[in-house]
Amino acid sequence: MTTDTHTLHIEEILDLLPHRFPFLLVDRVLDFEEGKFLRAVKNVSFNEPFFQGHFPGKPIFPGVLILEAMAQATGILAFKSRGKLEPGELYYFAGIDEARFKRPVVPGDQMIMEVEFVKERRGLTRFTGVAKVDGEIVCTATMMCARSKPAAPAESVVVKPDVVKPDVVNPVVKES
């Protein structure tokens, strides 16, 4: 990691990611180096909406959301490394390998996500990620992300519903 610290506050994160409450899972970027790594934080609050059902009386941060938080960190790293998206483009989570969960994350924890660029090939970028609480590993994974092409402008299409007569759909059989 570099000694030249780069941080991003929530306003800058909101400018890069399309996610919003309750699905924005990166609170701050603590450090990054373009094309190399990014370290971010998620402050886990008891007020998170999913704790009502996951699990009542024993709240645990869902593992899939730990992975999503790491994926959002990879998105920020990609944007800072490759530039902002063009209108109509989307940067999306394309796959995950070797996800492992080591211990639960609970309300009050401060989860640190560390992601590193591995390689880019055929439009897919591969990253490794580690999530930690108090220096202890809670999750590791390899993630793939893809940058989509801008969508072609939609043509004006008029859709006319088929006219179906009730007696054709439900024919009435008359008894002779």
Swiss-Prot record:
Could you tell me the keywords of this UniProt record? Cytoplasm, Lipid A biosynthesis, Lipid biosynthesis, Lipid metabolism, Lyase
Q: Which GO terms describe its cellular component?
A: cytoplasm; membrane
Q: Note whether ATP-binding occurs among the keywords.
A: no
According to its UniProt record, which reaction does this protein catalyse? a (3R)-hydroxyacyl-[ACP] = a (2E)-enoyl-[ACP] + H2O
Q: Domain of life, per the record?
A: Bacteria
The family database entries (Pfam families) matched by this protein are listed as: FabA
The question of whether Cytoplasm is a record keyword is answered with yes
**Which Gene Ontology BP annotations are present?**
fatty acid biosynthetic process; lipid A biosynthetic process
Q: Where in the cell is it found?
A: Cytoplasm
The EC class name is lyase
- HAMAP family (alphabetical): FabZ (MF_00406)
Q: NCBIfam families annotated for this entry?
A: fabZ, PRK00006.1
Which PANTHER family does the UniProt entry name for this protein?
3-HYDROXYACYL-[ACYL-CARRIER-PROTEIN] DEHYDRATASE
Protein family (similarity comment): Belongs to the thioester dehydratase family. FabZ subfamily.
Q: What is this protein called?
A: 3-hydroxyacyl-[acyl-carrier-protein] dehydratase FabZ
Gene giving rise to this polypeptide: fabZ
